[in-house]
Amino acid sequence: MKTPVASLVASLALAAASTSASGFRAAPVADYKADELSFGFSAGTTFVGGEAREHVFHPKGNLADYLEEFPGAPAKDRRHQLSRLDWDMAAAMLGVSGSVRYDRLSLNLGVWYGGSGSDDYDMKDYDWMEGDHVPYSEYSRSDTELTDAWLFDINVSCDLWRSDGFTGYVFAGAREQRWKWTCDGRNDYWYTENGHVWDHNDEHICDYRQVLFFGYVGLGGSWRLTDALSLSAYASWAPGWKGRDRDNHIGAGKIVNDSFDYDANVYAAGVSLDWHVAERATVSFGLDWQKATLNQGDLRQVEFESGEAEAMPDGAGMENEYLAFTIGLDYAF
């Protein structure tokens, strides 16, 4: 998978930095007040860099039929990969979040939206259509733009430990992410038989979207380093994620819809350096990482003209990983 660091560096060129929330999540930014209500608000910009992957597998079935169709595949492998599409995740996103706290409990809610604003990114398509070629039998690269990116996050946190200079807490919540790409112009082809072919056009080839939803639990802490600086960190885990994707193959004349049940995992971690510029205002610099591991689901393909549909149980796969850099302003009142 393309390193999230490389994509993050590319996404930082999309826009000038402005204010943002304390990281790419809904964080407990309201001040602690014993037996009292308090509120916090965050707003700003997040730069995301990473990669999303779309997989197509040979469906499970009769092993003899499978090996007859793909004689080069290992006999032990009944989930031979037919195709994999790697989509660049590079976006500048505006986000707002709020926090309502009573004593040690805090309810946190946030939303982010953005896109890449440019088609200077890649979709790489790898195919293994004739058994197990190393590294592939066919390859193409296309110009791609991440046109829409949404993130919704809600969680409840509870302080377990409070002392001078340190707060430790646990949290549980739910998150939904939506990513949509458009692909215009296919630039490079490579075939086993024909070698490299260069082709450039501005045709609208396909659209792709991923939607993920998951519940998660985690641990976090905040350390007061000096009167002006604090350091915050967290880690979270989701035991399963549910999702769907849709690949509108305009050039090929078909739509592919995939669905995924609660399976695979989501891991996340982050760190934030907070600069207390005033009694109630904080400028924060956050770095967040998230990885949704490979989930296998069902594929349904529909031809545009004939309307003919084909179902492939366990024929689809989806995953993604990103880094997000945030600069922002938090205000507690």
Predicted feature residues:
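Positively charged n-region of N-terminal signal peptides that target proteins for export
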Residues: M1-A6
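Residue-level signature of outer-membrane beta-barrel architecture
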Residues: G98-Y102, I154-L160, G221-W223, D227-L229, ...
